[in-house]
Amino acid sequence: WLPVVAEQVINGNGNYRERLQHAAATYTAQLLQDDSSALWLIDKQPHNFMHVDLILALFPNARFLYCRRHARDNALSLWMQSFQAGAQDFAYDFTDISAVIQGSRRLVNHWLTRYPDAIRIVQYEHLVSDPVCLLRGVADWLGLPSHDLVSNTPDKDSIISTASLWQARQPIHTRSLRRWEHYSAYVPELLQLPDH
């Protein structure tokens, strides 16, 4: 959606502020289709980090959680996933995966220097190992109450509009930590990525 919204801002009618307001309204309407009474909207598209300037222009109070994962585990997870054609074409070549991971980390670090109050980096390994502790800090940062942050039972009735529906319904686990180590003898390309 963000490329479409960006196009509206660049080529739309009216002055810049009006185009931003129209684009923000269009984007919000799209997100509210599934739950029109939602108080908070979460857009977990993996490439949103490339559009931080645009998102903050549209929604000045937006907050970004960037989940950083061990590069080799991240690469293996991408490489083993079957994506729609054109969606994540870099995910089938470890040189490309490495470039994307390292490039995204550099860009997020840039955004962090520009918008330190709007961005929080969380480590995947900490999230799955101690979700309550990590999420208490996130809730505090967002100004939300921290009670009932993690349920032992995934909410079967909550609306999830994403391809990872099945995964989102599973309990948090640590089975994927350092998973790359089990594959490195068979997929030595993993070793070209940093060990962090």
Language-model features: where?
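Conserved adenosine/adenylate-binding substructure
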Residues: 38-53
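PAPS-dependent sulfotransferases, especially Golgi type II membrane carbohydrate sulfotransferases
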Residues: 7-39, 78-121, 129-196
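Acidic, metal-coordinating catalytic cores used for nucleic-acid/nucleotide bond scission
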Residues: 46, 126-130
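Conserved phosphate-donor/acceptor-positioning beta-strand/loop module used by diverse small-molecule
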Residues: 55-79
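Active-site cores of enzymes that catalyze phosphoryl transfer or operate on phosphate-rich substrates
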Residues: 1-2, 12
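Conserved nucleotide-binding/hydrolysis micro-motifs of P-loop NTPases
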Residues: 1, 69-74, 127-128
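Structured core elements
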Residues: 41-43, 63-68, 121-124
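Short gly/Ser/Thr-rich phosphate-binding loop of adenylate-forming enzymes
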Residues: 52-55, 126
